[in-house]
Structures are given as structure tokens and as C-alpha cells.
UniProtKB/Swiss-Prot annotation:
<keyword id="KW-0443">Lipid metabolism</keyword>
<keyword id="KW-0444">Lipid biosynthesis</keyword>
<protein>
    <recommendedName>
        <fullName>Phthiodiolone/phenolphthiodiolone dimycocerosates ketoreductase</fullName>
        <ecNumber>1.2.-.-</ecNumber>
    </recommendedName>
</protein>
<dbReference type="Pfam" id="PF00296">
    <property type="entry name" value="Bac_luciferase"/>
</dbReference>
<dbReference type="InterPro" id="IPR036661">
    <property type="entry name" value="Luciferase-like_sf"/>
</dbReference>
<comment type="similarity">
    <text>Belongs to the mer family. Phthiodiolone/phenolphthiodiolone dimycocerosates ketoreductase subfamily.</text>
</comment>
<dbReference type="InterPro" id="IPR050564">
    <property type="entry name" value="F420-G6PD/mer"/>
</dbReference>
<dbReference type="GO" id="GO:0016705">
    <property type="term" value="F:oxidoreductase activity, acting on paired donors, with incorporation or reduction of molecular oxygen"/>
</dbReference>
<dbReference type="GO" id="GO:0006629">
    <property type="term" value="P:lipid metabolic process"/>
</dbReference>
<keyword id="KW-0560">Oxidoreductase</keyword>
<dbReference type="InterPro" id="IPR011251">
    <property type="entry name" value="Luciferase-like_dom"/>
</dbReference>
<comment type="function">
    <text>Catalyzes the reduction of the keto moiety of phthiodiolone dimycocerosates (DIM B) and glycosylated phenolphthiodiolone dimycocerosates to form the intermediate compounds phthiotriol and glycosylated phenolphthiotriol dimycocerosates during phthiocerol dimycocerosates (DIM A) and glycosylated phenolphthiocerol dimycocerosates (PGL) biosynthesis.</text>
</comment>
């Protein structure tokens, strides 16, 4: 069996000295490491408290002055494709939002990138998170139902052959709608779906080319969910084994175990654990600071937490939550952790979040062990 297929993700923050400085560096690193794909997120703000984005908590504030200054993903991928002729990596959004983005616009953006890159676009998509919808006036009462209708709309437009489309929908009704962009050589972008709950898993089985969750879960849980996705695919007449098992993982690494433990103890990386569900907290003998049964990233609203509130939440996060939530360790240790996923995952997208620590130099030096991890996973 060959090793993992590997992609690399970047948070697309507006950095210094130029807005794309960090993203370009990460892209060129991905090319040098000969990965398969490069990914960017779709957020209007970050998923940890902005009140902690201070130099005393994170050295990277010198390079990224505004943590919630997140750039737009489709624009960034177009910029990357135009500027970087080397490498010809596949380009994906991990993942776009079916809430605040009208599916017709998403269908157009993905199809456009696919044409301009000669077939290299991937449409990663999920229901989104509360933080990117509710504050901006998007109803958050039925995110999964909205997602299902968004996927049906995208498929209806892509399959229309340029003919007028009429479709009833409680969210996205189509009335004599036209979509005339062609596929690239007869193929639309692959659809990679982030799903966790039973209804979303069924939707992934119906629509996904790849099952692509993120955030905290165990390999055994992933395998069970993948079985649900493939069962749902079979129920609608699709080949269940044609669905690629993929996952996005966040990595904290360093030259030594002590450096990694120092990073994991930093306030921002511990705050990242707020994105874990209460189930993860329970496994480690705790309770989520937002309350019993809290879902984690999907319902987290971190950007209005003041500093003291954020620190009080961080203080009660069991260390095991962050360590389960993140691949962490020296390069060899992370490779060993990733190997635990080999029986259920064939494609791993890695995002280096080691810079979210107090020591800027050590955060930047994490690039070397991260690059080793990426290269070795392809052989695993």
C-alpha cells in the first residue's frame, strides 16, 4: 500500500509586509515538498478569542497584526493560480460555507477556478459555523437543512447543461435560472464534504467525492462515520468505495518535545481547544466551558469574549483535550500519531498551527519539522 496522499493548508491571514506573505511562503513550501494540494479556509473571522491576540500570548502578532483579518478564499486561490506556475497543485477550500454563500455563487466560483486552473479545483463544503453566519444576519436555526438544499442546488445547476432550471426549495428556489459555465473536459470540481452528525453523513453519502471532516475525533470514530457515509452512498445507488476518505488535521511541532509542550501550554493553542465538543472534554474528565453538550466549533462565538473571560475558559481546559485535538510532537512523534489513521484515511490535509505560541522564533522554526512530517507521510 502506498503512503498517504497529502495536502497542506494555510489560514490566509492578512500578514506583513504584504498581505499574502505567509500564504505565499506556505504555498512555495508545499510545492517544494511535492504535496498533492493546497487548501485555504472560508472564514470571516477566526475560531479563537481575538482578545488573546496580544504579543504576551503570541509572538506571531508581529507578523499578523489583526487576527480576524482573514482574506477571501476564492480570490486568494485565483491569485495563487495566476502567480505560481510551478507545482500545479490542486487548489481547494477547506471548507466553504453553505450558509452565508448562495449556492449559485459557490457553483460559479468553483467552476471558474476549475476552468482557469485546467481542472485543479476542489470544492470543500460544509454547513459552516455559527460565528460566520449569525453575526452577519444569516439564520442559523437549520444549518443542515440549508446545506442539503445548497448541495441539491449546486448539482441542479451543474447538471443543467445551460438549460433553464426550476426547482422548489425552502432556502434556494430556482425560477428560470441559468448556469452556462461548462465543466473542464467534462468534469466538475470534486466535492469534499465536512460532516459529523448522522444527517450530514447521509448528505455526504449522497453528494461527496470525498468525506473530509476536521476538528477533534478519534480514528475509531472516523471509521464509524465513514461506514455511515458509504452506507448512505450505497442507498442512493452510488459506489460507496469511490468516496475518498480524507481528513484535515492541525499540527503543533518543534525541534524537541520540550518545545512542543511549551507551545501546547500557550494560551492561544489551549484556547484552540474550545473548538472541541463536550464529548472530547468528557473523555478527559472535564466539561466544556460553554456548557454540557456544547458542540464545539460549529456553535462557538469567540470574537466577543473579553480577555479575562477567555483566560477563565482556557484555565479549565484539560491538557488532554488539546493533545487529542491536535497532532503534536516532534516530527517522528507526529508521524507515529498520523500512522494511527492509516487504516481508515487515505488523504490527509495538514495545517501547521505551531506559530500560535508565545515564542515567535520557535513558531517559525517549526517549519523544518513540519516539512519532514509532510514528506514522510507520503511514504507511510
Amino acid at each position: 500500500m502506498t503512503g498517504f496522499r497529502v495536502g497542506v493548508g494555510d489560514g490566509i491571514p492578512a500578514a506583513r509586509p504584504a498581505a499574502e506573505t505567509m500564504t505565499r511562503a506556505n504555498y512555495l513550501g508545499a510545492v517544494a515538498n511535492r504535496v498533492d494540494s493546497f487548501w485555504v479556509p472560508d472564514h470571516l473571522n477566526q475560531l479563537f478569542p481575538r482578545s488573546l491576540w496580544k504579543q504576551k500570548y503570541c509572538g506571531a502578532t508581529k507578523l499578523i497584526p489583526r487576527v480576524d483579518a482573514v482574506m477571501e478564499p476564492w480570490t486568494m486561490l485565483g491569485h495563487i493560480a495566476a502567480r505560481n506556475r510551478a507545482g500545479r497543485l490542486r487548489l481547494g477550500v477547506a471548507v466553504t460555507d453553505s450558509g452565508r454563500r448562495n449556492p449559485a455563487v459557490t457553483a460559479q466560483a468553483a467552476a471558474t477556478l476549475h476552468l482557469l486552473t485546467r481542472g485543479r479545483a476542489i470544492l470543500g463544503i460544509g454547513p459552516g459555523e455559527r460565528e460566520g453566519n449569525e453575526p452577519y444576519g444569516v439564520d442559523w436555526s437549520k444549518p443542515v437543512a440549508r446545506f442539503e438544499e445548497a448541495m441539491a442546488t449546486i448539482r441542479a445547476l451543474w447538471d443543467s447543461g445551460g438549460e433553464l432550471v426550476n426547482r422548489d426549495s425552502p432556502f434556494f428556489p430556482l425560477r428560470k435560472a441559468i448556469f452556462d459555465l461548462p465543466p473542464y473536459r467534462g468534469k466538475w470540481p470534486e466535492i469534499w464534504i465536512a460532516a459529523h452528525g448522522p444527517r450530514m453523513l447521509r448528505a455526504a453519502g449522497r453528494y461527496a467525492d470525498a468525506y473530509f471532516p476536521s476538528f477533534a475525533h478519534l480514528p475509531t470514530e472516523y471509521a464509524q462515520r465513514l461506514d455511515s457515509v458509504r452506507s448512505a452512498a450505497s442507498d442512493v445507488g452510488r459506489d460507496p468505495m469511490a468516496i475518498l476518505p480524507a481528513v484535515q488535521m492541525f499540527v503543533v511541532t518543534g525541534s524537541t518535545r520540550d518545545d512542543v509542550d511549551e507551545a501546547l501550554d500557550s494560551e492561544l493553542l489551549r484556547a484552540f481547544g474550545l473548538n472541541a465538543s463536550d464529548d472530547v472534554f468528557t473523555r478527559h474528565g472535564g466539561r466544556h466551558p460553554m456548557g454540557a453538550g456544547f458542540s464545539g466549533a460549529q456553535d462557538l462565538l469567540p470574537h466577543d469574549m473579553d480577555e479575562q473571560t477567555a483566560l477563565s475558559h482556557v484555565a479549565v481546559i484539560p491538557p488532554g483535550v488539546t493533545r487529542e485535538f491536535l497532532l503534536n510532537g516532534t516530527s517522528d512523534e507526529v508521524i507515529q500519531q498520523a500512522a494511527q489513521w492509516r487504516d481508515c484515511v487515505r488523504y490527509m490535509v495538514l495545517v501547521n498551527v505551531s506559530f500560535l505560541q508565545r515564542n515567535l522564533r520557535k513558531g517559525l522554526m517549526s517549519v523544518k519539522p513540519f516539512n519532514k512530517i509532510v514528506r514522510e507521510l507520503k511514504k507511510l
